[in-house]
Amino acid sequence: MRLSVRRVLLAAGCALVLVLAVQLGQQVLECRAVLAGLRSPRGAMRPEQEELVMVGTNHVEYRYGKAMPLIFVGGVPRSGTTLMRAMLDAHPEVRCGEETRIIPRVLAMRQAWSKSGREKLRLDEAGVTDEVLDAAMQAFILEVIAKHGEPARVLCNKDPFTLKSSVYLSRLFPNSKFLLMVRDGRASVHSMITRKVTIAGFDLSSYRDCLTKWNKAIEVMYAQCMEVGKDKCLPVYYEQLVLHPRRSLKLILDFLGIAWSDAVLHHEDLIGKPGGVSLSKIERSTDQVIKPVNLEALSKWTGHIPGDVVRDMAQIAPMLAQLGYDPYANPPNYGNPDPIVVNNTQRVLKGDYKTPANLKGYFQVNQNSTSSHLGSS
């Protein structure tokens, strides 16, 4: 009996020693890691700090990191970016939300720092290397996108000019995808001029100037899209999205790897609803996207562009032809609409659509207000 008790005590003692040895070993490894970080000229971020964790109203936990498949929607303003993001927002698994406005500004600053040799030298000398800046940009952009709206399985950002930085963003977020909204530049320019959408660098009193600036902006974005590659960047033609919404959205969701939902065809029914489409009262497209997809804005520009500009169109905006638009057609033949779009258009012309309760009375009061976008050099 005494021998048996001794064996039990001996076994318990050995187990205790083993546990203490394991704990001591773990502490030694942790101390080494800390000391290595202290000796290193740059501290290392712990892996768990690289993820954002958010809990939705449904008590589901969402984890976001640099490897997540973010969606970036952009293009020249007045090219259908708001319609595109509203359609995506209608999907139960996607959240885009309003324009952040700050992301394209920060991207422009980052680009300016890298372009200036003197500034880059100063930053490098101060230890603010490209690696440091990129890590900060990555964290900042992810934080803004994730926290400016409700969490969702798939996050999307819509700031028109972000797609001037598609190559850089694809480096920060390697699994991200991009939707470049493309629209007939004549329609985009007519819309920004008549709706007084101020964009830095665009002279809204001149069709010629605005078309020249449109050409420069879409040229940069299209080149970035091509460089990123067809597997990651999809040009989406506004006209085709409006004429054939079901066909276009099936292609878009397939490209994004997102399952089909009929809700994307009826974004107007989900405006202002929980988990639906949130609209900003200060974005100039809001009064249009509360309506079902319709033909109202497709060819409004015809007959309004000055004759000398129409005559020189191919030289002023060569990107029109490159994107497949006929610079001399007034109006071009964009194609025949689906029956549902014809029906929607008839409803809109009769005023047969609902204004969300939170926006009622707003459009009458603010119809003459302006909205601005940050352009870039």
From Swiss-Prot:
Residues 101-105 are annotated as: Interaction with peptide substrate. 3'-phosphoadenylyl sulfate binds at residues 78-82, 183, 191, 195, 238, 285-294, 300. Residues 26-377 are lumenal. This is Protein-tyrosine sulfotransferase 2. N-glycosylated. Disulfide bonds join 96-156, 225-233. The record marks 158, 285 as: Transition state stabilizer. It holds the Pfam family Sulfotransfer_3. It is a single-pass type II membrane protein. It is found in: Golgi apparatus membrane. Catalyzes the O-sulfation of tyrosine residues within acidic motifs of polypeptides, using 3'-phosphoadenylyl sulfate (PAPS) as cosubstrate. The active site is at 99 (proton donor/acceptor). Keywords: Disulfide bond, Glycoprotein, Golgi apparatus, Membrane, Signal-anchor, Transferase, Transmembrane, Transmembrane helix. It catalyses: L-tyrosyl-[protein] + 3'-phosphoadenylyl sulfate = O-sulfo-L-tyrosine-[protein] + adenosine 3',5'-bisphosphate + H(+). Its main location: Golgi. The chain crosses the membrane at residues 9-25. GO terms for molecular function: protein-tyrosine sulfotransferase activity. Glycans are attached at residues 343, 368. The gene is TPST2. SUPFAM superfamilies: P-loop containing nucleoside triphosphate hydrolases. GO terms for cellular component: Golgi membrane. Residues 1-8 are cytoplasmic. The keyword Glycoprotein applies.
